[in-house]
Amino acid sequence: METISPFVAIRRDLHKIPELGFQEFKTQQYLLNYIQSLPQERLDVRTWKTGIFVKVSGTAPRKTIGYRADIDGLPISEETGLPYRSEHAGQMHACGHDVHMSIALGVLTHFAHNPIRDDLLFIFQPAEEGPGGAKPMLESDIMREWKPDMIVALHIAPEYPVGTIATKEGLLFANTSELFIDLKGKGGHAAFPHLANDMVVAACALVTQLQSIVARNVDPLDSAVITIGKITSGTVQNVIAEHARLEGTIRTLSIDAMQAVKRRIEALVRGVEVAYECEAVIDYGAMYHEVYNNPALTTEFIQFAETHTDMNVIRCKEAMTGEDFGYMLAEIPGFMFWLGVDSPYGLHHAKLVPNEAAIDRAIAFLISYFSWKGNME
């Protein structure tokens, strides 16, 4: 029989019940049940929508250190074949938030039993994948009352081996924006295309034109990505489609590039309206702020990891990944780092299986870091 640590077991429990943004009711209850099993003398627990705040009072606090873990899953049908695979059809923890939660609970458990001088604030945040839980959580009355002096978060990285962390000072993750474009023309019989305005053709033309933006409208020394991940159009093979919907994402390493990309998208869409005699509506959906690591705190963290732990530390490059933790970092000094979990499949893949050995390594590492930071003069 397989022997696993308590927090690996927790991860497997949570992996079975992935839930989408602001629908994490089972997840919230599971977390609350566990938190309520801990010594309560120094804990103050409050809920916010489907999220949770847990404050651990220090022995003689001079500051509050925040730690954020996201809790939502993705609308992906799992293909791992694991015995603890998702029990929710069409939903999966394909971005490692089950790992994030189990690590947070492990660290919380230690400090519930072994308080340090400073206060700790654990933030279990819903809806990271969308529509975005960090910004409204940051603006909540609870956060205003308990606002930490610094804040930390991690994200699993399938490409790095267990025992590795990766981060950098300054910009770590990109600015991101959702992109939805609806095209409305005139449907008709497939035999009479001259009497209709075909939105399949219009959509295909627009997708091709959008890909020219990065090549011809963004500074080559800057970076941008435009991806159309989904196109919906038509009802049957012999009817010309009256409507088409494009769904995608924009990612840039600067606000200026994001604004330039959006201006060009709007110009191209106007051109498609004229060329294909259709109506178009653009919706940018949710936009996530860049993740910008506080240079001083990040340098200090890297030096701690290199000199006080056995973790392998990599100073990585910035990534085009999007993370709404950026909103918290825009108001609170802190940083985010990658945690190696050594999986052949990447984030958002239906076969993602993080190496669970990373969980206890991360718990021990963060306990060491917070103990050091939380007792520092």
Swiss-Prot record:
It catalyses: N-acetyl-(2S,6S)-2,6-diaminopimelate + H2O = (2S,6S)-2,6-diaminopimelate + acetate. Gene3D superfamilies: 3.30.70.360, Zn peptidases. Keywords: Amino-acid biosynthesis, Diaminopimelate biosynthesis, Hydrolase, Lysine biosynthesis. It is an enzyme of class 3 (hydrolase). It comes from the Bacteria. Pfam families: M20_dimer, Peptidase_M20. Pathway: Amino-acid biosynthesis; L-lysine biosynthesis via DAP pathway; LL-2,6-diaminopimelate from (S)-tetrahydrodipicolinate (acetylase route): step 3/3. Its EC number is 3.5.1.47. One of its GO terms (biological process) is diaminopimelate biosynthetic process. Belongs to the peptidase M20A family. N-acetyldiaminopimelate deacetylase subfamily. PANTHER family: N-ACETYLDIAMINOPIMELATE DEACETYLASE, PEPTIDASE M20 FAMILY MEMBER. Catalyzes the conversion of N-acetyl-diaminopimelate to diaminopimelate and acetate. This is N-acetyldiaminopimelate deacetylase. It comes from Geobacillus thermodenitrificans (strain NG80-2). The lineage of its organism: Bacteria, Bacillati, Bacillota, Bacilli, Bacillales.
